[in-house]
Amino acid sequence: DVERSRGLGDVYKRQALKTLLQETERARRFGFTESEYARARANYLQSLESAYNEREKTKHGSYVREYVQNFLNGEPIPGIEAKYAMMNQLAPNIPLQAMNMVMQQLVPDSNQVVIIAGPAKEGLKYPTKEEVISLLKGMKDLDLQAYVDKVSDEPLMKEAPKGGKIISEKEGDIYGSTKLVLSNGVTVYVKKTDFKADEIRMKGTSLGGKSIFPDKDALNFAVMDNVIAVGGLGNFSQVDLTKVLAGKKVSVNAGLGATTENVFGTCSPKDFETMMQLTYLTFTAPRKDAEAFESFKNRMKAQLESAQANPLSSINDSLQKAMYNNHPRVVMMKPEMVDQIDYDRILEMYNDRFKDASDFTFYFVGNIDLETAKPLIAEYLGALPAINRKETFKDTKMSIRKGVYKNEYAKEQQTPTATIVFLYSGKAPYTLKNDILLSFATQVLDMVYTEEVREKEGGTYGVNCYGDLQKYPKEQLLLQIVFQTDPAKKDKLAGIVVDELKKLAAEGPSDVHLQKVKEYMLKKYADNQKENGYWMNNLNDYFYYGMDMTEGYTDIVNSITAKDIQKFVSDLLKQGNEIEVTMTVPNK
């Protein structure tokens, strides 16, 4: 008995289903290749090694999952030490033939189940039961050849680049980091931690981002990150890269933000050089793959068509239009827009953003040995191209709509539901205290709405509050409140939501709510001290915003009063900027 569940893309195309069943039959009939098995085994053993290295830092959730599987399925709980030792002995000695026998047992000639799921949309046709059964019965008569796994023995980089030099080094910099300046202008901050034995995080960032490009490129820069990724790097397609990196714990990806271009990475300490090589190739050798791009477009069209069938997809589009007043840089992706994506222009834009590393700052946080890392940093990051541009981001005039704006529209839904979004915006200085006050306000509102809307009225599963304090391109504050309910209750509950927000602006929070939030924030702050991601964000914020988001944190949290929160929320509401978007169902 086997169930095969896959996203088929254009499910109405019978060829997709036929190919899926055909490849399953090929694996059943001929099995896997030695190279496929070797990669799968290497990846499995690497994941075990990572868990073993982190055994002193195992999260509670990992134990819970093991206990649940033991209770439900009788799965043993040997512990990671025993499992790691056992599998390192067993895995290399399990022959490929044994694996292929298991595949034949998993996919028998009978007792097969094919499940096809997709949107109910007019004009979208699915294979019938008879067609599926016919396909299944025809598999055993197909003329198939064994799969040939094309594996290159070519290294990720044939030769190391002509590296640069570290021209200055300063220990004891911000947050206990070491600052390195390279000969090509790249600045590096390295913070060694012992929070995770098997993790090094990396971020490289530079000012500019999407803001550098004109409005007419909005569609292209909206999809740039995904399009660039499908091509692979250097001489390797995306598929070939996964083969080359088998058994390694490493990843690197590039991204274009509104005001910055960034490269992100993570690796095990033993794979640090591989991360440096991938970073070098990310800057210097993005790969064009027309076939992979066409496949990407087909997948994207299918995803967008599926999203269109989901009424909830329209609420975000409506909110974005309301917020930015149909600004040309706000792209609402539709299936018919996919063919307008210009691959060559995307590559041109990407290369423009990454052809000059001289203004990039890199941060490394984790179990990194500085003396081992320094020559690799100099060799690969020091070799990145530099033309010494002096850049910053541009103001693209994407201002949030001022005043009061309301939009209510109806859409047919399988389960009649009203979705309501409130957005309040205004000016606010970008300070640590305001950032803390915003967190207080959203958490207090979450508790108030749980009590007043969910528990007393029973009208929703929950009201969610989100806040965002921004410094660039200009200082502003956003508060968003979202909930779903029965259309018959939407007006009453929306009234309660607004009234409770106004009450907070007039009276501030209760002592009980205030103390609960303080306790949580202080505990979270203490927990964060042992998180690599927390220190990575602090390093980035320090240099991007020019602000230490840790200095005096606990003192500020402890000093916050109900009056502080009342004034903070009141100052926002007094600016009079409110957007309300409601999606409901047609009146019958």
Please describe what each predicted stretch is.
Residues 19-22, 32-64, 246-352, 514-532:
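Acidic/histidine-enriched segments that form metal/cofactor-coordinating
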Residues 1, 203-266, 328-332, 448-462:
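M16/MPP (pitrilysin/insulinase) zinc-metallopeptidase core fold and M16-derived inactive scaffolds
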Residues 13-14, 26-33, 196, 208-214, ...:
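Short beta-strands and strand-coil junctions in structured, solvent-facing domains, enriched
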Residues 1, 47-93, 108, 307-357, ...:
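Scaffold signal of the M16-like zinc-metallopeptidase fold and its non-catalytic homologs
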Residues 2-8, 12:
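Single conserved hydrophobic/aromatic residue that forms the stacking wall/gate
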Residues 38-42, 69-215, 361-363, 368-412, ...:
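Proteolytic maturation boundary segments
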Residues 32, 39, 94, 109-112, ...:
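Extracytoplasmic
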